[in-house]
């Protein structure tokens, strides 16, 4: 099947806002990056300037301006960027590249993720096998679901905005949460089902069970209704 531009790295992300730029530039779709995050973090961490970063545990690098609360848990490999806060009881389980100016909040859990600069996951969020774009925000209690109930491989499905035709992309992955573009707002207590891709500048209503592709500049409403912003 031909490429679907709307769900490519080029369309979803501004790579100037992540240290993962050299990794992500190698691939077409963002989910192709997921199996390589851990190895990339280790290589990047070993090259970080020691006057700026402290290796607080094996393969865990924290910028000296970051604030990590005593009750937070950090497992490697992980990098925590400048001016980021990792708040009370947050759990970083490894393979987590967290950018600058982020908020990893109370009881939030991260696993195998790239978190771009200025992202907020501030209250009771689970983000696994996912990539969150620049200035994206997940409301309290919203989570990514990263494994299907039947344990089959995840597909990305939707309607291509360029052709108005349905697409179904195989990912080859059992674990795949969500890809959020730049400036995405996810409402409280929403569930982003496996294989969710949300285009830049889109909003999701609270309590939404999101599945598949949500185009850029859209609003995902109650009942799965998707409308264009300012239409």
Residue ranges and their predicted role:
Residues 29, 84, 113:
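Conserved hydrophobic/aromatic pocket- or pore-lining residues that grip, position, or stack substrates
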Residues 1-59, 167-171, 201, 207, ...:
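Terminal amphipathic alpha-helical/low-complexity segments used for targeting or macromolecular assembly
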Residues 74, 80, 92, 110, ...:
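Surface-exposed, flexible loop/turn segments at secondary-structure boundaries
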Residues 20-21, 115-117, 122-231:
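Glycine-rich hexapeptide-repeat left-handed beta-helix
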Residues 62-107:
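Glycine-rich active-site/cofactor-binding loop and its immediate structural neighborhood
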């Amino acid at each position: 099947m031909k490429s679907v531009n709307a769900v490519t790295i080029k369309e979803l992300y501004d790579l100037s806002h992540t240290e993962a730029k050299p990794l992500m530039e190698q691939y077409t779709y963002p989910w192709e990056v997921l199996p390589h995050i851990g190895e990339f973090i280790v290589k990047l961490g070993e090259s970080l300037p020691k006057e700026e970063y402290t290796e607080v545990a094996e393969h865990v690098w924290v910028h000296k301006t970051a604030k990590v609360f005593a009750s937070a848990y950090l497992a490697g490999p992980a990098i925590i960027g400048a001016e980021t806060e990792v708040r009370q009881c947050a759990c970083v389980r490894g393979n987590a590249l967290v950018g600058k100016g982020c908020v990893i909040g109370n009881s939030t859990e991260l696993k195998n993720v790239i978190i771009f600069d200025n992202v907020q996951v501030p209250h009771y969020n689970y983000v696994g096998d996912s990539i969150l774009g620049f200035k994206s925000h997940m409301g309290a209690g919203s989570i990514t679901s990263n494994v299907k109930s039947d344990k089959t491989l995840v597909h990305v499905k939707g309607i291509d905005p360029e052709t108005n035709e349905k697409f179904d992309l195989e990912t080859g992955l059992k674990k795949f949460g969500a890809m959020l573009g730049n400036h995405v707002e996810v409402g409280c207590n929403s569930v982003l089902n496996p294989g969710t891709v949300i285009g830049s500048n889109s909003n999701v209503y609270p309590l939404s069970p999101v599945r598949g592709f949500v185009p850029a500049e859209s609003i995902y409403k109650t009942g799965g209704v998707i409308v264009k912003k300012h239409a």
